Amino acid sequence: MTNFTLSPKGQKLVEMYTDMVDKGYKKVDGTYEANVYNDFELKKIRGSIKERFKIHKIKTVLDYGCGGSDWSSSGFNEDQSAFDFFELDRVYRYEPARSIDERTMVDAVICFDVLEHIFVSDVANVIRDIFSCAEKLVVLNGACYPANATLPNGENAHVTIRNPEWWKGVVDTISVEFPNVSVTLICSPTYNKMLAYPTYSDHARQS
């Protein structure tokens, strides 16, 4: 783990996300949603992630910005839990909006539906913190479109909307500080479309 402090804007965002967890949020269309950030977004591409985990022999995972994802409940893949589907030994979670902090060194860190919720001034430090917890692999997903949710202050919940090339540039820049950690970056130009860049590490790139 790195020792960093979010910017004042970033800290305020965490407070707002905590408020949304407790009270729900207003959608862009004006309707109200009480079930906040409980979707297990990793489920959409579980097959390709499982293949990646097998290649890197992943047994321990940190779910960075886990929301309400439940790794032990059945139904992730038919009657299997995510824990069983990925054949893991241990899962740790980090979710500041729910006061969960189990950050530690693991084989792989996954981060889905998080990066676009981070204030742009904090993005580099957060990605660096993610890499610092990984021994083998980092899997990142960033949304590149406006959210259906609004923050309590009326802003769109996706506070940092950038194109895939922007995210790739940021991740490339930080990944060189962790040459032995492979990274899979998956960007979502729209909710139902994903763009996956080839998995790489700086060490492999220089071989």
Listing of model-derived features with the role each one plays in the protein:
Residues 1-108, 124-127, 133, 144, ...:
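Conserved N-terminal segment of class I S-adenosyl-L-methionine
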Residues 108-121:
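A short SAM/SAH-binding and catalytic strip from SAM-dependent methyltransferases
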Residues 132-139:
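Conserved acidic-Pro-Pro-aromatic motif
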Residues 140-146:
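Short strand-turn motif at the edge of the Rossmann-like AdoMet-binding core
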